[in-house]
From Swiss-Prot:
PANTHER family: ENOLASE SUPERFAMILY, MANDELATE RACEMASE, MITOCHONDRIAL ENOLASE SUPERFAMILY MEMBER 1
Source taxonomy: Bacteria, Pseudomonadati, Pseudomonadota, Gammaproteobacteria, Enterobacterales
Name by which UniProt lists this protein: L-rhamnonate dehydratase
InterPro entries: Enolase-like_C_sf (IPR036849), Enolase-like_N (IPR029017), Enolase_C-like (IPR029065), L-Rhamnon_dehydrat (IPR023444), Mandel_Rmase/mucon_lact_enz_CS (IPR018110), Mandelate_racemase_C (IPR013342), Mandelate_racemase_N_dom (IPR013341), RHMD-like (IPR046945)
Active site: 329
A Pfam family hit: MR_MLE_C
Domain of life, per lineage: Bacteria
Length: 405
């Protein structure tokens, strides 16, 4: 009888945070909105708060960066560790150290689905449809996958069944699609700057931005718009048609997550050939099933917010069953290892985190070490051939441990 590898149990889970409202500002890391001054990501970008003029100019003005980065580390009995980062900060630390720890410690490192199910069910009474709690669960889940990969000596994508393509090709999200084209990306996604409170003038301004970028980038380069939940159905339909002459590939997250009927109406009335996409701020498997039923073209879960890799795999299966694509919201290595195994993810997102989008900067810089970035818009699967997610925690960052158990 062949020997079966004996897997260790989890000895301890630990949680730290960096950045956010109670630590240093501009820390970056898992909370990529927590950037310094003069950064494109905090420019005049349309949001649900833009209708209040005092919060229109800057997303940080209404507190988009107050949470900061959550870091979860799990340690096995043999001393090996796995970790992950997400957006949950100090409050996420409390949830891990005071509640979720009981479902993690003492389990085998391979008990990922069991731990995941127990975390979900134990937090139902205060998690609602996602948000902070789901971000925290996602971070734990990713840390568990990282640990499991390191214990067995395999990259996470091989634990999921292996790659279905040799490389991942990327589009870039940022303010300068023209620069993204020069860097080898297949497309560029820009934020909208105006919303329903700006009326038709806002539509004309955003359409003019698309027209300008189309002239700079040429006919074949993809252009997309990220609307970040800032619109209503009528405005979104008008904006989509205003941008149609400039061959806009898709219009993204026009409406808040709960407005499923609105997404169905938008898809029905969008210009022929223009895709409708959403999912970044949906936080449960059930919400993605309902979103899929609206008929949108691409679902865009964030693996650090939707329940982790365990849930992302299930979301991809839902999308595949309906002939839809799943293109995760930019999550660096945490999505790279997933999407290279998905047959319905032909490309992926890279979020530009340099202030003016002119240089390639790792998305979760500086909290991750050895975080890969695309070369000529691509990452080859061989880059991912390291145990776990293939990155290390930068312990020179100011890691704050606010709680213990």
């Amino acid at each position: 009888m062949e020997n079966i590898m004996t897997l260790p149990k989890i000895k301890q889970v630990r949680a730290w945070f960096t950045g956010g409202a109670t630590a240093e500002k501009g820390a970056g890391g898992g909370d990529y909105h927590d950037q310094g001054a003069n950064h494109w990501i905090d420019d005049h970008i349309a949001t649900p708060m833009s209708k209040y003029r005092e919060y229109e100019q800057s997303r940080q003005s209404f507190g988009i960066n107050v949470l900061g980065t959550l870091i979860v580390e799990v340690e096995a009995e043999n001393g090996q560790t796995g970790f992950a980062v997400s957006t949950a900060g100090e409050m996420g630390c409390f949830i891990v150290e005071k509640h979720l720890n009981r479902f993690i410690e003492g389990k085998c490192v391979s008990d990922i689905k069991l731990i995941h199910d127990q975390m979900l069910n134990a937090t139902l009474y205060y998690s609602g449809s996602g948000g902070l709690v789901m971000n925290t669960i996602s971070c734990v889940d990713l840390a568990l996958w990282d640990l499991f990969g390191k214990v067995v000596g395999l990259p996470v994508y091989k634990l999921l069944g292996g790659a279905v393509r040799d490389e991942i090709q990327f589009y870039a999200t940022g303010a300068r699609p023209d620069l993204a084209k020069e860097m080898g990306f297949i497309g560029g996604k820009m934020p909208t700057h105006w919303g329903p409170h700006d009326g038709d003038a806002g539509i004309r301004k955003d359409a003019a931005m698309v027209a300008d970028m189309r002239e700079k980038c040429g006919e074949d380069f993809w252009l997309m718009l990220d609307c970040w939940m800032s619109q209503d159905v009528n405005y979104a339909i008008k904006l989509a048609h205003a941008c149609a002459p400039y061959n806009l590939k898709w219009i993204e997250e026009c409406l808040p997550p709960q407005q499923y009927e609105g997404y169905r109406e938008l898809k029905h009335n969008a210009p022929a050939g223009m895709m409708v996409t959403s999912g970044e701020h949906h936080g449960t498997l059930q919400s993605f099933r309902t979103l899929s039923e609206t008929g949108i073209d691409i679902m865009q879960p964030d693996v650090g917010w939707c329940g982790g890799l365990t849930t992302l795999v299930e979301i991809a299966a839902i999308a595949k069953s309906r002939g839809q694509l799943v293109v995760p919201h930019g999550s660096s290595v945490y999505s790279h290892h997933a999407v290279i195994t998905f047959t319905n993810t032909p490309f992926s997102e890279f979020l530009m985190t340099s202030p003016d989008c002119s240089t390639m900067r790792p998305q979760f810089d500086p909290i991750l070490l050895n975080e890969p970035v695309p070369v000529n818009g691509r990452i080859h699967k061989s880059v991912l051939d390291k145990p776990g997610f293939g990155v290390e925690l930068n312990r020179d960052c100011n890691l704050n441990p606010p709680y213990s158990h």
